[in-house]
């Protein structure tokens, strides 16, 4: 009997050590993942003919450092080629920076909007120690949107576009903090961060156990004071009154498009959805630029108005 108890204790100890180690490693990879270099993104976008840096730099613009609530500066560029009170705020995805938002900026400025592109927390030239996939980032988005209203007047009309982490950040902002924007465009958001991590763990480690999430979350709380289970757009999307256009390419393996299907079902009208047959993660615009533009224009015309 004593030997069995010793064996049981040893097994339990090994189990705890294993999942504690996995949880710590996973939290490190997720909180401190390697970011793409700005110049690498510029070259990628230029080669794909989605970026003409000289043309972008010739647009009327202001580089602004906006104080975050978390004691760092948010690096933003306000691009204003149009004489209008209509603004788009563009939120990039994880590992990217504001340069990757320029392809959308070109689309929206052609539609008559002015645009704000900015580096998310810990990305590009914005401060911040940890990436939290929308938990703290939503407060920075709130700060950027409030800056637009404070500096361009209370009668401005703001739309927000986000892709991947930026889309999740946008939905969390709209559902938890503020409904100041007129409309939202969500491209390839996850429905819950926990489900997305389970998907990633199962792909890259072949281990999809919920226990890894539990131990990972313990280290999230200890190291960055947030819970991954609170990063859940699906829980708040029904609180958004304004129109939302959901976009998600069906071949996406990183965040399956079923995440967006769930979000769309939960959102109350007005809403619209488009699921392109081509393109991987956040490649809906890259693979279908003209259709993307038509879908966005139709959504704005039908649900917002020009």
Where are these regions (language model features)?
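Alpha/beta-hydrolase active-site loop
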Residues: 131-152
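Catalytic active-site module of serine/aspartate enzymes centered on a nucleophile-bearing elbow/loop
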Residues: 287-306
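The serine-hydrolase catalytic nucleophile loop
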Residues: 94-107
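Hydrolase active-site cap/lid region
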Residues: 172-226
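Conserved alpha/beta-hydrolase
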Residues: 108-127
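An N-terminal hydrophobic leader/cap segment in hydrolases
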Residues: 4, 10-67
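Catalytic histidine neighborhood in serine/cysteine hydrolases
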Residues: 264-282, 289
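Short beta-strand/loop motif that positions the catalytic acidic residue
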Residues: 239-241, 246-248, 252
